[in-house]
């Protein structure tokens, strides 16, 4: 029998895999395998309906500790439901099991370079390394521990199958790594902090590229609102929204609404890269020896990483504000000349004017955003989903927009002070600017430009989300 031959010749490359090889690797007869698959189907079909729908699959996966947030249930239904009737009967379930076990056997054989019927840590590490995935020794040990149920230091095909059988995604080493990250390693429900696991992965550059393009498109689309917001923030009179729009149009026509957008877009990539790098450096410091930093640790690490990134790119932000608030009868100034004038006339410290209120607002914003996001998600589960499933992407997007708007509102006075300090060439301190605004304009002075800021939230978040998802598909990150 070919299956036996391939098993008995460790150094020989196996022939094309078949279900016969799968049965031999599992030490299982066709009858026993049929009974096992039938029992698994009945486990999901606990209502004895004879078919599986999205709710049954969701409940079954949840009972197996597979978080609903990763939409495995809908993906599983989509893969199994060959006739597209919205349910999975036993024959469809059976066909999925045949295809999945054969697929898992093929990649198991590819990783098992010794062809001795098991995967050792060195073989798993080599497979991950070839796929461009760099993981630490402790992460590799954790990977082995989660799959190796009998803790004998190797992974058999049965253990491999049990770990991956219900993962509906294609069995590539990259997808298997993602599955382990999601199910066993991390829980990335937070929106205001950097998720664990991303920076250790070789595809981080692709994720940063996708996020960078999404940010660039989003910022360009909402640039007129940003220009209007900044123009209103630096005003000390009640000029109003419409007169300000007319003033911008009168000075530079349509291009006036996009003044400073080039710098705003240019900030995206370096800011994201620095934030990820700083987060990775801070994680072991905050988490200690075990590396588990928890939600509060991630919030702190994310906030500090954001502060590092903000400090690094802050001169670009200040020059952007100067460009947007520059008033001249000869038109828009040249970027290089404006930067040179700041350096010569005000000195290098001027490029960090307003940094203090900017940094003060980072962690409060992230904390309010996170708390509001989780609260809104819980409310949506309780009132709309009746605790049956995790909110889908549209609900999560809505929760994110609302929580982001709330967080921004709470720290908005700091943003106004920062913008005014950036635009002002005099050496006014944060305290002096605060008192000047309070005495001259009252509390409403701290909220100038907040309405354009609100109106930015929905289009900005929606465009970012749609472009990011499209880029993930194009870059094969799903």
Swiss-Prot record:
Q: Where does Ca(2+) 2 bind?
A: 148, 150, 152, 159
Q: Which InterPro entries match?
A: EF-hand-dom_pair (IPR011992), EF_Hand_1_Ca_BS (IPR018247), EF_hand_dom (IPR002048), Mit_carrier (IPR002067), Mitochondrial_sb/sol_carrier (IPR018108), Mt_carrier_dom_sf (IPR023395)
Q: How is its activity regulated?
A: Counter-exchange transport activity is saturable and inhibited by pyridoxal-5'-phosphate, EDTA and EGTA. Activated by calcium Ca(2+) and manganese Mn(2+) ions, and slightly by iron Fe(2+) and zinc Zn(2+) ions. Repressed by copper ions Cu(2+) and slightly by magnesium Mg(2+) ions. Magnesium Mg(2+) ions promotes slightly ATP uptake, ATP-Mg(2+) being exchanged with ATP(4-).
**Carries keyword Transmembrane helix?**
yes
Q: Where in the cell is it found?
A: Mitochondrion inner membrane
Q: Which GO terms describe its cellular component?
A: mitochondrial inner membrane; mitochondrion
Tell me, using the record's free text, what induces this protein. By stress conditions.
Mitochondrial matrix face of the membrane: 226-259, 317-353, 415-448
Q: Which residues lie on this side of the membrane: Mitochondrial intermembrane?
A: 1-207, 280-302, 374-396, 469-478
Tissue expression notes: Expressed at high levels in flowers, leaves, stems, roots and seedlings, mostly in flowers.
In which family does this protein belong, per the annotation? Belongs to the mitochondrial carrier (TC 2.A.29) family.
Q: What does this protein do?
A: Calcium-dependent mitochondrial carrier protein that catalyzes the import of ATP co-transported with metal divalent cations across the mitochondrial inner membrane in exchange for phosphate (Pi). Can transport phosphate, AMP, ADP, ATP, adenosine 5'-phosphosulfate and, to a lesser extent, other nucleotides. Binds calcium ions Ca(2+). Mediates also calcium uptake.
- Domain note: The N-terminal domain can bind calcium.
Q: What is this protein called?
A: Calcium-dependent mitochondrial ATP-magnesium/phosphate carrier protein 1
**Which organism was this protein described from?**
Arabidopsis thaliana
The gene name reads APC1
């Amino acid at each position: 029998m070919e299956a036996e031959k391939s098993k008995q010749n460790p150094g020989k490359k196996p022939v094309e895999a078949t279900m016969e090889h799968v049965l031999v690797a599992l030490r299982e007869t066709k009858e026993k395998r049929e009974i096992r698959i039938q029992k698994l189907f009945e486990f999901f079909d606990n209502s004895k309906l004879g078919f599986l729908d999205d709710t049954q699959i969701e409940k079954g996966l949840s009972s197996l500790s597979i978080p609903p947030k990763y939409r495995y249930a809908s993906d599983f239904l989509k893969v199994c439901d060959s006739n597209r009737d919205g349910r999975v009967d036993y024959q469809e379930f059976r066909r999925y099991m045949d295809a999945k076990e054969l697929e898992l056997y093929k990649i198991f054989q590819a990783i098992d370079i010794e062809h001795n019927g098991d995967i050792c840590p060195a073989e798993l590490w080599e497979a991950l390394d070839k796929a461009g995935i760099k993981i630490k020794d402790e992460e590799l040990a954790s990977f082995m521990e989660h799959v190796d149920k009998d803790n004998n230091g190797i992974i058999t095909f049965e253990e491999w199958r049990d770990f991956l059988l219900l993962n509906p995604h294609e069995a590539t080493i990259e997808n298997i790594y993602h599955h382990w990250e999601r199910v066993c390693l991390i829980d990335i429900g937070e929106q205001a902090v950097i998720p664990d696991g991303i920076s250790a992965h070789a595809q981080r550059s692709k994720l940063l590229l996708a996020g960078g393009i999404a940010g660039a498109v989003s910022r360009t689309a909402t640039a007129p609102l940003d220009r209007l917001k900044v123009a209103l923030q630096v005003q000390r009179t009640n000029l109003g929204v419409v007169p300000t729009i007319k003033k911008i149009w009168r000075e530079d026509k349509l291009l006036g609404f996009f003044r400073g957008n080039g710098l705003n877009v240019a900030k995206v990539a370096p800011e994201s890269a620095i934030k990820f790098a700083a987060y990775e450096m801070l994680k072991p410091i905050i988490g200690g020896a075990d590396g588990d930093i928890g939600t509060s640790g991630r919030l702190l690490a994310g906030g500090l990483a954001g502060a590092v990134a903000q400090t690094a790119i802050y001169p670009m932000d200040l020059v952007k504000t100067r460009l947007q608030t520059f008033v001249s009868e000869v038109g828009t100034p040249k970027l290089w000349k404006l930067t040179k004038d700041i350096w010569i006339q005000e000195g290098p410290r001027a490029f960090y004017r307003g940094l203090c209120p900017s940094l003060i607002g980072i962690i409060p914003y992230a904390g309010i955003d996170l708390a509001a996001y989780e609260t809104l998600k819980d409310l949506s589960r309780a009132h709309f989903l009746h605790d049956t499933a995790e909110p889908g992407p549209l609900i999560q997007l809505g929760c994110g927009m609302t929580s982001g708007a709330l967080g921004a509102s709470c720290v908005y006075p700091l943003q106004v002070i920062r913008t005014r300090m950036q635009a002002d060439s005099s050496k006014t301190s944060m305290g002096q600017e605060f008192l000047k605004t309070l005495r001259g304009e009252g509390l409403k002075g701290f909220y100038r430009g907040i309405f354009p800021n609100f109106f930015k939230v929905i289009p900005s978040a929606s465009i970012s989300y749609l472009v990011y998802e499209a880029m993930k598909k194009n870059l094969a990150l799903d």
